[in-house]
A protein has these predicted regions:
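Outer-membrane beta-barrel pore domains
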Residues: 25, 38, 57, 64-65, ...
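Outer membrane beta-barrel
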Residues: 27-58, 63-221, 261, 293-324, ...
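Bacterial N-terminal signal peptides that target proteins for export
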Residues: 1-8
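C-terminal intrinsically disordered extensions
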Residues: 1, 199-203, 212, 220, ...
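Hydrophobic helical h-region of N-terminal Sec-dependent signal peptides
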Residues: 9-13
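N-terminal signal peptide c-region/cleavage motif recognized by signal peptidases
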Residues: 17-18
Length: 403
């Protein structure tokens, strides 16, 4: 069955016309299917594939799997966007990457939208709660191969829920109530939560300022009741080993807050983001952990601008793509990332990362990335012999295509 799903995905992907170097980089009109004489019915295929190769160089005495050089299909999405009469829209999309590793296909976005006004959008189904700037930014447009360590450590994921987003001028307000991921529907998981985010993005000088904050409250029920766990990979996804890990913590809920600050001016961007999560522990002192990152980046190619729209980073569109005899867009980025999983008697470890990256975008739909990371691990969950303080180096590259 896994092989069948993989062949279906590859067959559909192969049917999508590849961008020719002789073609313009202007988007091709979306294929539509119309009912009767109206134009409100439409359907548009969408997808992406990301292929990663990463090398993780950890001390030889650290016990872990898939260190050294490994390759993986990081994401292989296939789905459709559509519109319906009455200001309705929908998206159905699944990730087939697991099929290449004998795992299951998982739904990503599966939702229905309704726009009663130009400013308000209501969404019902599985989509992202509003955790913060980098988590809301599509993985197609992130500056590093992997998002900040806290986004995975704190369990940020898509969930089934009902939300609303109000956007007017420089203000964006998002809020919703969410349950669980579709993969957990059969796991007797009755957890639910409430998430909200506010972004103010006024013009400032020659650029745009981004100021945001988010708040989250989650009640753990069913199979998730009683424990939480926070852990993170070492700046690469090719291993399942986490060098920082709190282990299971008795808790019946979570409360967290995030803060976002960014400035985008032409080819330049700077970002500062942090998130603090508290495990709510009945009869015991609550435990709090936090993570954050600071980043600067610059597009080196003339005429190129950092993409930003709707409270998130967006696609880089080369001013001089290879289809017109240029070299595309080249961006360099530097980041400091910190994840602290120590609090009181709980010692999950401290992971600090200095990341350097380069992004090459030859045309809108193609992207190549390379990252180097130097990690400093303190109080590691997995020691190097008897030493719980050590360093790790990672190097990763990605080839990406989307339509």
């Amino acid at each position: 069955m896994a092989r069948l799903h993989s062949l279906v995905f590859l067959g559909v992907l192969a049917s999508v016309p590849a961008p020719s170097l002789a073609q313009s980089t202007q988007p091709t009109p979306s294929p539509t299917s119309e009912a009767s004489s109206g134009s409100e019915w439409s359907i548009k295929p969408r997808g992406r594939i990301q292929v990663d190769v990463a090398d993780i160089n950890a001390p030889a005495t650290v016990a872990g799997d898939n260190f050294g050089t490994e390759a993986e299909i990081r994401r292989a999405y296939l789905g459709v966007d559509g519109t319906l009469p009455g200001n309705l829209g929908f998206r159905v999309e699944a990730d087939f990457a697991g099929e290449f590793a004998d795992e299951s296909v998982q739904f990503t976005d599966v939702y229905l939208t309704y726009k009663p006004t130009d400013e308000l959008t209501l969404t019902l189904g599985q989509h992202k709660p509003f955790f913060g700037l980098e988590e809301q930014t599509s993985d197609l447009f992130t500056s590093m191969l992997e998002r900040a360590a806290f986004t995975s450590a704190f369990g940020f994921e898509r969930r089934i829920g009902l939300s609303g987003a109000y956007s007017r001028g420089d203000l964006l307000v998002q809020a919703g109530a969410f349950t669980v991921h579709t993969a957990d529907l059969d796991a007797d998981d009755d957890s639910y939560g409430f998430d909200g985010r506010v972004v103010f993005s006024p013009k400032l000088g020659v650029g745009e300022l981004h100021i945001g904050g988010s708040a989250h409250l989650r009640e753990l029920k069913g199979s998730d009741a009683g424990t939480v766990r926070y852990r993170a990979r070492p700046f690469a996804h090719t291993t399942d080993t986490r060098l920082v890990d709190t282990g299971s913590i008795a808790a019946n809920g979570e409360r967290s807050f995030g803060a976002e600050l960014a400035y985008i001016a032409g080819p330049f961007h700077a970002t500062l983001e942090g998130h603090r999560i508290t495990a709510l522990r009945p009869g015991l002192p609550n435990s709090s952990f936090w993570g954050g990152y600071a980043e600067v980046g610059m597009l080196l190619t003339p005429g190129d601008k950092t993409g930003y729209r709707g409270g998130t980073y967006d696609r880089i569109r080369p001013a001089d793509p290879v289809t017109e005899g240029g070299i595309g867009a080249v961006q360099v980025n530097a980041r400091y990332d910190r994840l602290d999983l120590n609090d009181g008697a709980i010692t999950g470890g401290l992971q600090q990362t200095l990341g350097l990256g380069v992004v090459w975008v030859p045309v809108d739909s193609l992207r190549f990335q390379a990252n180097y990371g130097r990690l400093w691990i303190s109080d590691a969950a997995i020691p190097a012999g008897t030493d719980r303080d050590y360093r790790v180096d990672t190097l990763g590259v990605r080839a990406q295509f989307d339509f």
